């Protein structure tokens, strides 16, 4: 039995905490909202994020980050990308021993263009970090809590650390593979949210299955181009954390990014969409980072670029789609390389 703390009591943090508790681990969830911690402890529910779910009675919560830090041998970071530095700052003062960190956030920090593992390595004291492992893949929280079969990947340059995380989470409903390609896994997990926003827009415009199939395929091509240029393994992008996560995020009603894109395609403005969603839509922030990364690495990312225009330059979605369709003629395989 491992002592594990999950930082973040949103839908994904709560679902993973449920997996860990059901696997017999001593699991504590940290939330910055005291009333949410009390609800989890007293009612064994998290109505805002998982309204139909009863949480295990051996899963506990706290709003005291000092208690969270001292409890854990392994810490799972399940907070939005924009909150990671702030949470790490609070956590750093309370860490008393070396800890294995697992992050499950999918994003890239705009401007700094750092991946999550880089932000963690920069924000946490090195002497208190055992290893940093990323856990990613096609995994909607709403299905995990129903024990629907789910398969993900644990990635770390230190494969022993990845295998430890594999052992922590794996059970008959939740299968975990390992990978040593942290860059590829993180880039695939982050950028699929960008393509999912675009997929939602095509559905909002009622453009049908042909358009969405093309968008997913061409989206994978540009994710792969960038990921390989940044040092990722090209084979990673055809795996669970690339194509797998892209499919589920572009096609499922559980996907926040798809839902947000769908509203944009129906004519809503970005701020209206974000206000109505009431939850973090990582793809919006990541689109800005993707646009910056494309410029930095000199990689063609036409879908991400047009989406950036829709989100931040008030270009109409239909105009952006027309621009993609009328790009210069290309050979498909050559275009996937460059």
Curated annotation (Swiss-Prot):
Catalytic activity: sn-glycerol 3-phosphate + NAD(+) = dihydroxyacetone phosphate + NADH + H(+); sn-glycerol 3-phosphate + NADP(+) = dihydroxyacetone phosphate + NADPH + H(+)
GO cellular component: cytosol
InterPro entries: 6-PGluconate_DH-like_C_sf, 6PGD_dom2, G3P_DH_NAD-dep, G3P_DH_NAD-dep_C, G3P_DH_NAD-dep_N, NAD(P)-bd_dom_sf
Keywords: Cytoplasm, Lipid biosynthesis, Lipid metabolism, NAD, NADP, Nucleotide-binding, Oxidoreductase, Phospholipid biosynthesis, Phospholipid metabolism
SUPFAM superfamilies: 6-phosphogluconate dehydrogenase C-terminal domain-like, NAD(P)-binding Rossmann-fold domains
Residues of the active site: 192 (proton acceptor)
Protein's name in the database: Glycerol-3-phosphate dehydrogenase [NAD(P)+]
Organism: Lysinibacillus sphaericus (strain C3-41)
